[in-house]
Amino acid sequence: MKPPLLVFIVCLLWLKDSHCAPTWKDKTAISENLKSFSEVGEIDADEEVKKALTGIKQMKIMMERKEKEHTNLMSTLKKCREEKQEALKLLNEVQEHLEEEERLCRESLADSWGECRSCLENNCMRIYTTCQPSWSSVKNKIERFFRKIYQFLFPFHEDNEKDLPISEKLIEEDAQLTQMEDVFSQLTVDVNSLFNRSFNVFRQMQQEFDQTFQSHFISDTDLTEPYFFPAFSKEPMTKADLEQCWDIPNFFQLFCNFSVSIYESVSETITKMLKAIEDLPKQDKAPDHGGLISKMLPGQDRGLCGELDQNLSRCFKFHEKCQKCQAHLSEDCPDVPALHTELDEAIRLVNVSNQQYGQILQMTRKHLEDTAYLVEKMRGQFGWVSELANQAPETEIIFNSIQVVPRIHEGNISKQDETMMTDLSILPSSNFTLKIPLEESAESSNFIGYVVAKALQHFKEHFKTW
C-alpha cells in the first residue's frame, strides 16, 4: 500500500481535477467523499514526494562537494599552522643568536659608547643634514642604526611570561581545529542518515514512479544545485592561493643577504658623509664661495646653515669621533647590525604567517557556517519525506468527523458565517482539526490546494529534528 500521505494528497488532487468536490449544501456527501480519500489506490506518485526526494539527493551531492572543499581547507590550514610554527622557531633561533652577539658586543663597546652617542647627537650632524636635504634619508637610516645599538647596550628586560600566551594560543588553536572537524563530521553523518532513510522511501514507492524519475534518482550524475543556495559573501580562493607554501629556508636566506647589504650601505653612507664634511673647508677657502651653502637654501635655513661655515673646526672633531665609532662597530660588532635586520625580517615573517593562518581560518569557519546553513535549509524543505519510511504499510489517513460550525455575529447566524471543521489522523502526528474558512469552501477552485497545503504544513511542523 502506498504511504498514506501520498494517498491523501493525490486523492485530493484527483477530486479537484475530476470536478467532484463536495458542496456545502450536501454535508452527507462531503463526509462520505472525505472518508473515501484513504481508499483510493491506483494514482500516480505525488509531485511533492518526488520533489522532496530530488531535494534530498541534491543535499547529498552538495554535502559531498562541501566535504572535498572542507578537506582542502583544513589541509591548507594545518599546513599554514606548521609554517607559522616554523617561523616562530626561526625567530627564536635568531633571537638567541642575537642575544649572544649582543652580550659580546656589549662588553666591547661599553667604554666607547660615549663617543658613539656624541657622534649621533652632535649638532654638526643636524646642521649638515639640514643644509644638504638629499642626505636626510641617510641621517634617518643612521639614527635608526644607532638606536638599535643603544637598545642592546642598555637593554630593557622584558617579562619572560610572554611565552605563556604563545603556548596557550597553540592549545586554543588545537581546540578550534578539533571542534571544526567534529562539527563537519556530524553534519556529514546527519546528511548520510537522512539520505539513507529517504532512499528507503524511494525503494518502497519505486513501482509508483515513472522510469525517468527512477533513473534520475539512482544515477550518479551531479544535479544542478537548488535555486535557494545562498551566495557566499566572499569569493572562493583559487587553488594556487590555497596551496601557497612558504619556502622558509630560502626565504630567510634572502633576508640574510638583504640585511648584509643594508649594513654595508650604512657603512658606506657614513664614510661618504664624513668625506663630504672633510671637503667643506676646501670649498669655503675658494674665492667667492663664502656662505655658498646659506645662499642656496631658503631663508628659514640660512641661519642654521651659517653655523656650519662658522664651526668647521668643531665639526672636524665630530668627524673624528664618528670615525672612531664606526671603527668600533665594524671591528668589535660585525654581526650585530645584520642580526638586528634579520630579527626584524624574522618578526615580519611571523606576522605574515599569522596573518595567512588567520585568513585561512576565517575562510574555513565561513565555509563551515555556510554548509551548516545549507544543510538546515534543505532539511527543513525536504527532510519530511524521510519520515515516510517509518510508517507501517497499513497506516492510513483517517477522517474521524466532519461538522459545520456556525459563528455567532451579533446574535445572527447565517450560511456565510459557517466554518467547516474536520478531524484528521495523519501519519505519526496526533489527531488535529482542520478549519476551512468560507472563502476556501468546496465550491472554490482553491479548496483542494488549500487542504493539501495545510496537510503538508502540519506534517512539516511536526517533523522531528535531528
UniProtKB/Swiss-Prot annotation:
One of its GO terms (molecular function) is misfolded protein binding. Residues 57-111 form a coiled coil. Pfam families: Clusterin (PF01093). Residues 1-20 form the signal peptide. One of its GO terms (cellular component) is nucleus. Keywords: Coiled coil, Disulfide bond, Glycoprotein, Secreted, Signal. It is found in: Secreted. Glycans are attached at residues 196, 257, 311, 351, 412, 431. The keyword Nucleotide-binding does not apply. InterPro entries: Clusterin-like, Clusterin_C, Clusterin_N. Disulfide bonds join 105-333, 116-325, 119-322, 124-315, 131-305. It comes from the Eukaryota. PANTHER family: CLUSTERIN, CLUSTERIN-LIKE PROTEIN 1. Belongs to the clusterin family. This is Clusterin-like protein 1. It comes from Homo sapiens. The gene is CLUL1.
